Amino acid sequence: MHAVSSSHLFYLAFCLLVLTSSATAGPETLCGAELVDALQFVCGDRGFYFNKPTGYGSSSRRAPQTGIVDECCFRSCDLRRLEMYCAPLKPAKSARSVRAQRHTDMPKTQKEVHLKNASRGSAGNKNYRM
């Protein structure tokens, strides 16, 4: 488990203050290092993108793309908006099932080894034993 450092607690408190708007306060914006710190806190180990990832086969003549700076620095944004820029979770690697594996190199029993040697016949050595 990771210990929570005082800087993480500060960023948590900061994010909560910035991202929760009260009736008297105007909308808040996140810019520069504050925006990066908020994204690191929200996304954690997944990482984040400054622009939303595009799908395959996207046209080079598309409309100009807005990024996190446009949405959270020039305008205000909420926690859900920040989460949209987090990298997707990588699927956990599952342990392979033992039953699903084919066992072709299974050790042979003594009887199988004896029968195999007996079927070879004598190769000039009458006293051949295993």
From Swiss-Prot:
Disulfide cysteine pairs (residue numbers)? C31-C73, C43-C86, C72-C77
Return the annotated region ranges for A. 67-87
Q: Which residue ranges make up the pro-region?
A: 96-130
Could you say which protein family the record assigns here?
Belongs to the insulin family.
**Example GO biological process:** positive regulation of phosphatidylinositol 3-kinase/protein kinase B signal transduction
Matching entries from CDD domains are given as: IlGF
Gene3D superfamilies from the UniProt entry: Insulin-like
Name the job this protein performs. Answer: The insulin-like growth factors, isolated from plasma, are structurally and functionally related to insulin but have a much higher growth-promoting activity. May be a physiological regulator of [1-14C]-2-deoxy-D-glucose (2DG) transport and glycogen synthesis in osteoblasts. Stimulates glucose transport in bone-derived osteoblastic (PyMS) cells and is effective at much lower concentrations than insulin, not only regarding glycogen and DNA synthesis but also with regard to enhancing glucose uptake. May play a role in synapse maturation.
A Pfam family cross-referenced in the UniProt record is: Insulin
What name goes with this protein? Insulin-like growth factor 1
Basic and acidic residues biased stretches: 102-115
- Keyword terms of this UniProt record: Disulfide bond, Growth factor, Secreted, Signal
Instruction: Supply the source organism's classification.
Output: Eukaryota, Metazoa, Chordata, Craniata, Vertebrata
Q: Does this UniProt record's set of keywords contain rRNA processing?
A: no
Which segments of the protein form a coiled coil according to its record? none
UniProt GO cellular component terms:
alphav-beta3 integrin-IGF-1-IGF1R complex; exocytic vesicle; extracellular space
Residue ranges of the region described as B: 26-54
The record's annotation in InterPro entries points to: IGF-I, Insulin-like, Insulin-like_growth_factor, Insulin-like_sf, Insulin_CS, Insulin_family
- Segments for region (C): 55-66
In the UniProt record, the signal sequence range is 1-25
Q: Which GO terms describe its molecular function?
A: growth factor activity; hormone activity; insulin-like growth factor receptor binding
